[in-house]
UniProtKB/Swiss-Prot annotation:
This is dTTP/UTP pyrophosphatase. The active site is at D67. InterPro entries: ITPase-like_fam, Maf-like. Nucleoside triphosphate pyrophosphatase that hydrolyzes dTTP and UTP. May have a dual role in cell division arrest and in preventing the incorporation of modified nucleotides into cellular nucleic acids. Its EC number is 3.6.1.9. It is an enzyme of class 3 (hydrolase).
Length: 190
């Protein structure tokens, strides 16, 4: 039984490899949606990605998909997806600095005619940034393509005061949840 990761995200690939899994990574091609609720958004996108890839596979493969969004409670349109460019990174950091936000991930596993979907949430507190820090970070390019416009495992680690919950969720794939789900589908590391 093979494992297929419905993502080409370097962070998800690295996390899953570190956990000891062998797999093939594939782009899902699923058009992501943004709903009113961050949990529903992450879960709907994870399910859509898993089902899109599973529908192209003929055999016994198990498909793993995930979606991560950053949510800023109390902010109109508080769901922050992936930063598109340096300007987007600066804008998102401006919203997040000095506040606590939530990182929501949906995880979906499909195989054998069934789909399981779960959700993880982690709280992150970002400190107030010094003048020029947002520009410095945006210029390095690391935040482009990242939910909320930052990468906790990279240079943005210096902006974070604390996290409450699963660190790997903030990186892009909540490993404890993912491993439990994969086990239920008969997939183990090694």
């Amino acid at each position: 039984m093979g494992l297929v990761l419905a993502s080409e995200s370097a962070r998800r690939v690295e996390l899953l490899r570190r956990a000891g899994y062998g797999f093939e990574a594939r782009r899902s091609g699923f058009p992501e949606v943004v709903l009113d609720d961050p949990r529903e958004t992450a879960v709907a996108n994870a399910r859509g990605k898993a089902e899109a890839v599973a529908s192209t596979l003929p055999g016994e493969e198990v498909v793993l998909a995930a979606d991560t969004v950053v949510y800023l409670p109390g902010e109109p349109g508080g769901i922050l997806g992936q930063a598109r460019d340096a300007g987007d990174v600066r804008r998102m950091l401006g919203l997040l600095e000095g506040r606590t936000h939530e990182v929501h991930s949906g995880v979906a596993v499909a195989g054998g005619g069934r789909v399981a979907v779960r959700h993880a949430v982690t709280e992150v507190r970002m400190r107030r940034l010094e003048p020029g820090e947002a520009e410095w970070y945006a210029a390095c390019g690391e935040g482009v393509g990242k939910a909320g416009g930052y990468a906790l495992q990279g240079r943005a680690a210096v902006f974070v005061e604390w996290i409450f919950g699963d660190y790997t969720n903030v990186v892009g794939l909540p490993l404890p949840l993912t491993i439990r789900m994969l086990r239920r589908f008969g997939v183990r590391p090694g």
